[in-house]
């Protein structure tokens, strides 16, 4: 019996109907440059720069399927009004030889009810910190409406020229919360057993697949673990992933974990930029963060490729293409992932630190990125997501450039 050779990082690879120029994609990271949800030149330039830097595909982060599905008021709602700007974005990415993906979702319990001025949707009645009060479980009619929103949004993404659509099934946003035994206490067709808790995400994915057609890839960002007590863990997430695979509507699954609602550091790892978070918030919120921040943001030591131990179990159980995510900063990590059977890797912070990193990997001028996992990029989502270390170097170099 012969073993198939490990694919090269820089050979073209298939993702559903698409051919990607290499095995590295830019993971969705909220860009923070969409004032009142508008497509801006900064957003377009952000993704064009990533594409120019060599990534095979760049993902526009968190496009809400409705105003109520926004994380806050500066979240893009992907509807017909956004089409002209989104077409400019996909054209800019394509001009650099890369493909463009749109991450679409509904924030659910993570939504900011006050700025959205809409009702928060959740699987079940519970207290919600972002809503600052009790949130009632969504009705069947409301959930039907969200399915229609996903379907419409997928059509807009296709019209805008996106090559792939990533459905957000992670971090305890709406679809992820339906999978979670901690958040889903329903007693109807969408709650109870593992199979029933998978039913609503299945319905949404099918609607997106039908709307997207056969020439656009459909993927899911999927929670392997919520990282919280009584939440979703591998004993239940693996069977759900197998159900989604059997449905046949997904071209790939990007594996993640954690909860934006209850445990945000789980999918970052490394240093907690608490002082920077406090400074980025209004005074009252900042005071609260100062005292309760250590509980809200527990510390997890950073390890290169930190989701690999969990993801390895998914690789063994599934046949569909898988995208490895989580602290990938080195060439040898990527090679190891491909050797273990992952079709692609997704990078985020490393490309914030150096958008040219993929080109440098290919030229063999470096074998690892410069990200130090200080996570000080996290609080910049309110003013334009960026690497503050990179910013400081640019400022420091400016006088030399003027000499």
UniProtKB/Swiss-Prot annotation:
Xref: CDD domains: OYE_like_FMN_family
Matches recorded under InterPro entries: Aldolase_TIM (IPR013785), NADH_flavin_oxidoreductase (IPR051799), OxRdtase_FMN_N (IPR001155)
Entry function: Involved in the degradation of the organic disulfide 4,4'-dithiodibutyric acid (DTDB). Catalyzes the initial cleavage of DTDB into 2 molecules of 4-mercaptobutyric acid (4MB). Low activities are observed with other disulfide compounds, such as 3,3'-dithiodipropionic acid DTDP, 3,3'-thiodipropionic acid TDP and DTNB.
pH and activity: Optimum pH is 8.0.
Keywords: Flavoprotein, FMN, NAD, Oxidoreductase
Disruption phenotype: Disruption of the gene results in a complete loss of DTDB degradation. Mutant cannot grow with DTDB as the sole carbon source.
The protein's required cofactors: FMN
Binding site residues for FMN: 103, 348-349
Protein name, as recorded: 4,4'-dithiodibutanoate disulfide reductase
Molecular function terms from GO: FMN binding; oxidoreductase activity
Catalysed reactions, as listed in the record: 2 4-sulfanylbutanoate + NAD(+) = 4,4'-disulfanyldibutanoate + NADH + H(+)
Active site, UniProt feature: 173
Organism: Rhodococcus erythropolis (Arthrobacter picolinophilus)
Activity regulation (record text): Inactivated by cobalt, nickel and zinc ions.
Thermal dependence of function as given in the entry: Optimum temperature is 45 degrees Celsius.
EC number: 1.8.1.20
Gene responsible for this protein: nox
Similarity remark: Belongs to the NADH:flavin oxidoreductase/NADH oxidase family.
